[in-house]
Structure formats: C-alpha cells, structure tokens
Swiss-Prot record:
Gene designation: kdpB
Family the UniProt entry places it in: Belongs to the cation transport ATPase (P-type) (TC 3.A.3) family. Type IA subfamily.
Protein's UniProt name: Potassium-transporting ATPase ATP-binding subunit
Top-level taxon: Bacteria
Disulfide pairings: none
Length: 682
C-alpha cells in the first residue's frame, strides 16, 4: 500500500518554498550550484549597473538594465523555488513520520524474561541491549528483536498498511520497529539500537535529505555543466573587445544577458530538484532509500535476482494431483495423504485434505476422535505424518522419504522416481507418501505463476536487464517454472552461500545486481548486492545490510524500484538535452540583437524577426527564467517512462527533448517579443 500522494503544487508547500527560495539567495547557498552562482553574480552586477545608470554615474538605459537585472534575479529565485519545493515535499513526508514518534515511557525489565521486575523509564533513554516489556495497547519504544512472546502488531504508522502483522520470538518475524503499536498479547523485546539510531529516525533523516550528498552521475553532470559554463564565459568575455574594435562596444548588461542565456541554466536550476524528487518518488512507492546513490544505482541495474515464492509465483502451493505408485489405487493414496495432513495447518497441508475430499468424497476426520499421534514437520526430518492403528504414514520430500524407507528395510520403487521427475518437469513440487516401508505414490503441489509476470520479464529483457529466479526447489522443478515465467536464468537449491557467490560472479563481469531479502541468512548477499531491498517484515540484520527497505514487504517491488531509478536517470538526461539544445534559439535571438549594429551582416541571423535589439535580449532572458518554472512539474514527477532498449530510448528522448528543446525557445521568445511590443514595454 502506498502513502497518500501530495498534490504537485500543494498551497502550503508552495508558500513555504517561496520563503525558502528567498532565503537561498545568500552566497553560501548559491555557491553549491556553480551554474546558478554565475547567474547570481550576473544579477548582482547588473543591479549595480542599473543603480549607477539611474544615478547618472554611468551612461546607458537604466530601465532596460533594471529589467534585465530583475529577470536574472527571477531566474535565480525560480531555480531556488524548484529545489525548495522538492525539499518541501520530502520534509512534509518526514513530518508525517515524526508524528509517529511519541514521548513515552517504557517498562525496562531487570531480567530478560516475562514477569521480571520492571522500571519505568523514558523511551528515549533506552540503550542497545536493554530488555523491555510491551503489552496490548502499548507503543513499541525501540527497534529490537522479540526474545519471548508473540503478538499482533499495528505497523500502519510506518508502512501505511492497515492489516496487523504477527511478531513472535524466533525465526524471521522477530524484528519489531519503534513507533508501532501492540494490538494483543505481549512481547519481551531486546533493543537493538541506541537513541537516535532507530529505523524511524533513519527514515526521517533520509526523507528530509538535509545532508543529501550528490550522486556520482550528478557530480559528473555538474562537472560537465561547469565546463560548459567556463567555455561560454570565456567566449562571452572575448566578444567585448571584438565589438569595441568595431566601434560600437556592447554593454556589460547585454554581455551578462548573453552569458546567462547560453549557459545551461535550465538543468542547472533543476538538477537538485530532480535528485530530491527521485527519493521522494521512491518513498511514494513505500520504499525507503538510504541515499540518492541507491536510487541512482537502481536505474543502472542490469541483473535482477528474484525469489520465486511471492515474486514470480503466488507462493501458496496447492495439491493438484495424486499419482499412485505401481499396484496402488489412487483412493488409497488420497486416504493416506489426507490422514498424514490432518494436523498440517500449512496451505499445502490444507489443500491435500481438500483435494482428497473433492476427488473421493473423503470427509475430513475428527482429529480428536482418532486417538492418533501426529508427527510434525521439522527441518531435520523434512517429513510429517500420523501414527494411527498400527499404521505409520508419512509424507515429505523425495530424499527424506527415501531415507525413511531404506531405514525401515524397504526399497524405493523406480517407477516412483520416474513419477517424481515427471512432476518436477511440469513445474510442480513432488511430495512422496509412504506407509511403513511401502511407498504409496506422489502428491503434486502446483505453484501458480503470477499473471502478467512473463510480460514484465519480457519488458525487462528489452531494457537489457537479465532476470534470475532464486529458489530452493530442485533443478527440474526450477527449470520448468523458469521456462513458464520467462526468466533468463535460475539458481536452484539456493543457499545463502550460493546466492552470495552468484552476485560476486555477476559483479566480476561488470554488472550491477539487485536483490531482495528478509532473513538473517540473506544479510551477506544483501550487503554484497548493488541494490539490496530488505523487507520491513524481515530481521534487523537484513534491514541493516540492505540499502533500501520496502515498507510493504512485497518482493515484487524490486521491479518498481528499478523503474523509479531509471525514470530519475531519464529525467536528468532528458532535461539536460533540452537545456543544451534550447541555447541555439537564444543564440539566434541575442547575437544579432547585440552585434548587428557593429556587424550588419549578422542581421541575417535574425530569423525570428524580433522587434528590436532590446526586445530580443529581454525576451530571451524572460524565456530563460520562465522555462525553469514550466519544467518544475516534469522534474518532480519524472519523464514518462517506457520500457525500451537503450538505443530506442536514446532516439525517443532526442526526438522529444532534443527537437523540443530546439523548437520551443523559438516559439516562446517570439511570443514574448510580441507581447512586449504590443504592451509597449520596449
């Protein structure tokens, strides 16, 4: 579930952003953006010239110079506004998280067990290793691990999901988050962080982005923009002696206007906003990224490691068929399978009971009246079953049943081996049923591939992204499901060590790898992956190892994370293309206006037939400022994203933003020139 989205121009955010835009006019803030710092200096210089002209200290048109100066200041303000609005949206999201933090007291236990004596202490004084007791109605005071008890927990304040979740000691569901509420029962929790280091604190810090560091691509683009600015600065500086030598020196105001229009102010003014908005969009998808670097890396990912269960398949395997061994009828197999599953509360176990009922009208027996001994499944035995009336019935994995049969002096039939292979090749999971040492047959558990997932993988393939399915199934089952789902490769019988080795192998080939995980055993692979999305329902170790946390705990979200990362990179690239190409139109507007008096031949470049030199220069400066405002929605929302190959995406962006950047300024400058002329302002 996603959080409520803020309107693009929320009135309160706009007002706050306008205030922040004015505050950012100080030199220290401007220095962080070299391109806009040049505009700021130009604004200051033309302001001083305007004052000097107005006072008579300098010759020239004070009104024209003041108009240029005013619009240069507006250009700086608009760039500040874009950044402030993006930051304001992030801070608004952070404020909603701050509302979760409440000043509360915690019951700190003197001993790590339920019922021990407790001291009431402020929650913000809890340290790592402290043990606390929380009961129904309490707010969990710290991040930690459940060491005793089990409870229903409302995590909606963090995740936005209203459905409660179960948290209990042991396993992968022992991690709890400070700020969530206990709905029932009780938990004894060991705090895993010190004050100020909780998941909620880190979320707020990341979302606010007060100390947002530039990403590598952002730094590289900034260097390019600085280089272009220096080139245009030197080129503009050389124009004054040329015009002076021609007998009609161009004014400093016009040269400043020319410089500002030629340097890439559009992308320079929107660059920070694009980065902040990328992290904000990620939060809109209920994913917390540790940094802009993580969001950017998501856009460069070219290998996705996807867990089969829950990501590629629905995750609830259902019994689909009873396949009896030679000499055994299907009803006998179904009866034994149902008996072995009566106490099995897993979805698979319940589906076996239901299938036997549907196929042979074998009604579900009353467990209490059977006077039977039920054998639960364990990781060691990998079997479960029932002992009843001198009958010992078991169901389990092929290897486990084979060992059981041989241990009881029996022989595993070759025809059952063939049936097991047949089930696995069809993409189902085989469970074998045995009574005593006699193998009765095979149950096929079918895991349903999610609808539309094959098409999504085809889109990823077009984008040059390789998909790899990770599963604990045997190779035959894994190969069948991989073929049905349309993934490029698979890792069967996966272990944490195998996943880690696979990630390192791809990285050694120069690829960027993304994966999801939720358990402590996933932590090494998460730490190694370039993009590691930890599930919020997972362990603390997994969340600390990842560089993103999915608050919805939805493994499929990894594909959306990649889309958001690519959208941010595309937005930056598209607006850079637009910014650089629209300099061409400004060149045709300002160069003839500024130098035609000295070099009449340049009148041939006045293809827009602008009214006068003053209106041409002022129109270009006004357009240069206004285009930043018009592009703010695109910077915040991101460009329209379509899954295409890199070459197709490049062609599309060049046509839309390259050609658009070339044509829009011609139209915009001409319209502004007409308006200025009609209104008699030039």
């Amino acid at each position: 579930m996603s959080r409520k989205q803020l309107a693009l121009f929320e009135p309160t955010l706009v007002v706050q952003a306008l205030k922040e835009a004015v505050k950012k006019l100080n030199p220290q803030a401007q220095w962080r953006n070299p391109v806009m710092f040049i505009v700021w200096i130009g604004s200051l210089l033309t302001t001083c010239i305007s004052i000097a002209m107005a006072s008579g200290a300098m010759p020239g048109n004070a009104l024209f110079s003041a108009a240029i100066s005013g619009w240069l200041w507006v250009t700086v303000l608009f760039a500040n506004f874009a950044e402030a609005l993006a930051e304001g949206r992030s801070k608004a999201q952070a404020n909603s998280l701050k509302g979760v933090k409440k000043t509360a007291f915690a019951r700190k236990l003197r001993e790590p067990k339920y019922g021990a004596a407790a001291d009431k202490v402020p929650a913000d004084q809890l340290r790592k290793g402290d043990i606390v007791l929380v009961e129904a109605g309490d707010i969990i005071p710290c991040d930690g691990e459940v060491i005793e008890g089990g409870a229903s927990v409302d995590e909606s304040a963090i995740t936005g999901e209203s459905a409660p979740v179960i948290r209990e000691s042991g396993g992968d569901f022992a991690s709890v988050t400070g700020g969530t509420r206990i709905l029932s029962d009780w938990l004894v929790i060991e705090c895993s962080v010190n004050p100020g280091e909780t998941f909620l604190d880190r979320m707020i810090a990341m979302v606010e982005g007060a100390q947002r560091r530039k990403t590598p691509n952002e730094i590289a683009l900034t260097i390019l923009l600085i280089a272009l600015t220096i080139v245009f600065l030197l080129a503009t500086a050389t124009l004054w002696p040329f015009s002076a030598w021609g007998g009609n020196a161009v004014s400093v105001t016009v040269l400043v206007a020319l410089l500002v229009c030629l340097i890439p102010t559009t992308i320079g003014g929107l660059l920070s906003a694009i980065g902040v908005a990328g992290m904000s969009r990620m939060l809109g998808a209920n994913v917390i990224a540790t940094s802009g670097r993580a969001v950017e890396a998501a856009g460069d990912v070219d290998v996705l490691l996807l867990d089969k269960t829950g990501t590629i398949t629905l995750g609830n395997r259902q019994a689909s068929e009873f396949i009896p061994a030679q000499g055994v009828d299907e009803k006998t197999l179904a009866d034994a399978a149902q008996l072995a599953s009566l106490a099995d509360e897993t979805p698979e176990g319940r589906s076996i009971v239901i299938l036997a009922k549907q196929r042979f009208n074998l009604r579900e027996r009353d467990v209490q009246s059977l006077h039977a001994t039920f054998v639960p499944f364990t990781a060691q035995s990998r079997m479960s079953g029932i002992n009843i009336d001198n009958r010992m019935i078991r169901k389990g994995s092929v290897d486990a049943i084979r060992r059981h049969v041989e241990a009881n002096g029996g022989h595993f039939p070759a025809d059952v081996d063939q049936k097991v292979d047949q089930v696995a090749r069809q993409g189902a999971t085989p469970l074998v049923v045995v009574e005593g040492s006699r193998v009765l047959g095979v149950i096929a558990l079918k895991d349903i591939v999610k609808g539309g997932i094959k098409e999504r993988f085809a889109q990823l393939r077009k984008m040059g992204i390789k998909t790899v399915m990770i599963t604990g199934d045997n190779r035959l089952t894994a190969a069948a499901i991989a073929a049905e789902a349309g993934v490029d490769d698979f890792l069967a019988e996966a272990t944490p060590e195998a996943k880690l080795a696979l990630i390192r192998q791809y990285q050694a080939e120069g690829r960027l790898v993304a994966m999801t995980g939720d358990g402590t055993n996933d932590a090494p692979a998460l730490a190694q992956a370039d993009i590691a999305v930890a599930m919020n329902s997972g362990t603390q170790a997994a969340k600390e190892a990842g560089n993103m946390v999915d608050l919805d705990s939805n493994p499929t979200k990894l594909i959306e994370v990649v889309h958001i990362g690519k959208q941010m990179l595309m937005t930056r690239g598209s607006l850079t293309t637009f910014s650089i190409t629209n300099d061409v139109a400004k060149y045709f507007a300002i160069i003839p206006a500024a130098f035609a008096a000295t070099y009449p031949q340049l009148n041939a470049l006045n293809i827009m037939r602008l009214h006068s030199p003053d209106s041409a220069i002022l129109s270009a400066v006004i357009f240069n400022a206004l285009i930043i405002v018009f592009l703010i929605p695109l910077a915040l929302k991101g460009v329209s994203y379509k899954p295409l190959t890199a070459s197709a995406m490049l062609r599309r962006n060049l046509w839309i933003y390259g050609l658009g950047g070339l044509l829009v300024p011609f139209i915009g400058i001409k319209v502004i020139d007409l308006l200025l002329t009609v209104c008699g302002l030039v």
